[in-house]
A protein has these predicted regions:
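Intrinsically disordered, low-complexity regulatory segments
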Residues: 1-121, 130, 384-388, 394
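Long, highly charged, low-complexity internal segments
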Residues: 1-12, 18-21, 51, 141-239, ...
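Short, polar/flexible loop-turn hinges at active-site or ligand-entry regions and domain interfaces
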Residues: 63-65, 83-87, 107-114, 164-167, ...
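A glycine-rich phosphate-binding loop feature that marks nucleotide/adenosyl-phosphate handling sites
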Residues: 119-120, 140-151, 173-179, 236, ...
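Core structural elements
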Residues: 120-131, 202-214, 232-243, 272-291, ...
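Accessory beta->alpha helical hairpin/"wing" motif in late/C-terminal subdomains of nucleic-acid enzymes
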Residues: 244-266, 414-450
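Leucine-rich, amphipathic alpha-helical/linker segments
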Residues: 270-289, 452-494
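Substrate/cofactor-recognition hotspot
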Residues: 346-363, 393, 420-423, 427-446, ...
Length: 497
């Protein structure tokens, strides 16, 4: 609601039909979809919370430690009223130590985090709903949606398909583990001369602990887990007190994390903070228990955790090994530099031929190649047609979102899920492909509303939301900009080509 150049959100309780599952906010005792009167209204739970709060007079809210959690805390505070003393407890792991520390350091609700989340929610409603209505009008169905992040992501997937269809010639030399652009010979075998021109020993740092995007990427690549499944498993692990909060873009390691790594690694421990202290920490285990120790404790009833499956343990193992590797001494490597001559070409090939150390054993992120035979000899070659690029995986999409500044750790998975839900994309062998509907929707939006769904404009808006979080700019100024944009979308008459 706009009131004298300011904006006031209007809230209503969420209702859900127990018969058909339809969710709505309209004040009605009848389901708008199926007509059933069997309705679950959140107002009942709100009234129960109010009654409990008034009985005690004091309430501590411990929702998730991010802007969404802060907004939920703020909502609860407003619903309970001023007659109750309300404080916020923030903890990043569900362990007795972390919860005790949170209770000893209660704070007020961070209004800037709340304002930033309000901007995100309202922007999503205004722009997303306005664009979606245009889709409904043109495509004659309400099972479609659009949004600032959703549309560019769909475009990346379409572009990945395009590159996959375009081919280029490549020469493979299997014996040398080499791939050379172009066609270097018409014959199945060529003479090559390999010389060793240098070798050295060195060291490289292990990778940092997981952030949300990196966890999702590796879970898809290594465990073949869809993004949605990974986030659900991580939520379970967090709620079971086994890992820290899993929606984070920070690699920072707390003193508690350092202590856990030191206890597990012993002589292999080096210890790294991986950044400055901030509101969030990396994703890490809360105890110095590897997968097998944890599994043994659960199966022998030493530790009772309900519902832990093999998938939970596999994801835990990935998080544990990555974190412990990040706290190890550097990986020792041996590098060899070769000069390879064939026909009129000369190639220099520098490769890691060995890697050692606990970090490499825990998380082998270093690609090791075999040493090459020296001298002049004949070797086989194979000319193949390779694509200019490959279709994106779910992990690729999330990495792009992180790199391009679109979306946040809490929204990475939901964006991908929505594209599946709307039937804009399908997945084949871990690759994402657009459907005919997805391509039509993307073409319509980019041709008629290019400014509203462009990567650059979306990135700038997200930067402004971050500035609202830091208290640098007014959230109402940002909302005013979005409101003007929304009116432009509403009045535009789209064309269909």
């Amino acid at each position: 609601m706009e009131v004298k150049e300011s904006f006031t959100p209007i809230y209503s309780s969420i209702k859900r039909c127990r018969v058909c599952g339809y969710q709505f906010t309209k004040e009605s005792k009848v389901c708008p979809r199926c007509g059933s009167k069997d309705i679950d209204d959140a107002r009942t739970r709100i009234e129960n919370l109010r009654r409990l709060a008034y009985e005690t007079g004091n309430v501590i809210i411990g929702t998730d430690p991010d802007s969404e959690g802060e907004k939920i805390s703020w909502d609860i505070k407003n619903l309970l009223g001023d007659s109750v003393n309300i404080k916020r407890a923030e903890f990043h792991e569900v362990t007795p130590k972390a919860i005790k520390e949170a209770l000893m350091n209660l704070r007020e609700i961070d209004e800037n985090l709340v304002k930033a989340q309000i901007v995100r929610r309202i922007e999503d409603r205004w722009i997303g709903f306005s664009l979606s209505q245009k889709l409904w009008e043109v495509f004659k169905t309400k099972n479609l949606s659009a949004g600032r992040v959703q549309t560019p992501v769909l475009g990346w997937i379409i572009d990945g398909e395009r590159k996959f269809k375009e081919k280029r010639p490549v020469t493979l030399i299997p014996e040398l583990e080499l791939e050379v652009d172009g066609k270097i010979s018409d014959k199945p075998e060529i003479y090559v001369k390999v010389e060793l021109i240098g070798e050295k020993e060195g060291s490289i740092s292990p990778p940092p602990p997981y952030t949300t995007d990196e966890m999702l990427k590796d879970a898809a690549r290594i465990l073949r887990l869809p993004v949605k499944d990974t986030m659900k498993l991580a939520q379970d692990l967090f709620e079971s007190g086994l890992i820290t909060y899993h929606r984070t873009d920070s690699t920072y390691v707390s003193d508690r994390g350092i202590k856990i790594a030191k206890e597990f690694l012993g002589a292999d421990f080096k210890g790294r903070k991986w950044g400055k202290v901030g509101a969030h920490e990396c994703i890490r285990p809360t105890k110095p228990w590897d997968r097998y120790t944890l599994q043994k404790m659960i199966y022998s009833d030493v530790l009772y955790i309900e519902g832990i499956t093999e998938k939970h343990l596999s994801l835990y193992n990935l998080i544990f090994n990555r974190f412990m590797a990040s706290q190890c001494k550097d990986i020792r490597i041996k590098i060899k530099n070769y000069r390879i001559k064939f026909d009129s070409k000369i190639l220099n090939d520098e490769r890691i031929v060995s890697a050692e150390g606990r970090a490499f054993e825990l998380f082998g992120n270093v690609k090791v190649k075999r040493e090459l035979p020296l001298g002049e000899f004949k070797t086989s070659v194979k000319i193949v047609k390779k694509p200019l690029g490959y279709p994106l995986s779910q992990a690729d999409v999330i990495r792009n979102m992180k790199e391009k500044g679109l979306g946040r750790p809490s929204t990475y998975s939901t964006i991908v899920e929505k594209l599946f839900l709307r039937k804009y994309i399908v997945e084949r062998k871990s690759w994402l492909f657009s459907t005919n509907l997805g391509r039509k929707v993307w073409k319509f939006l980019t041709e008629n509303f290019p400014d509203f769904v462009s990567e650059e404009r979306t990135r700038i808006l997200f930067e402004k939301m971050d500035r609202v979080e830091r208290g640098e700019i007014s959230f109402e100024d940002v909302l005013r900009e979005v409101y003007i944009e929304t009116k432009e979308v509403i009045k535009k008459v789209p064309s269909v080509s």
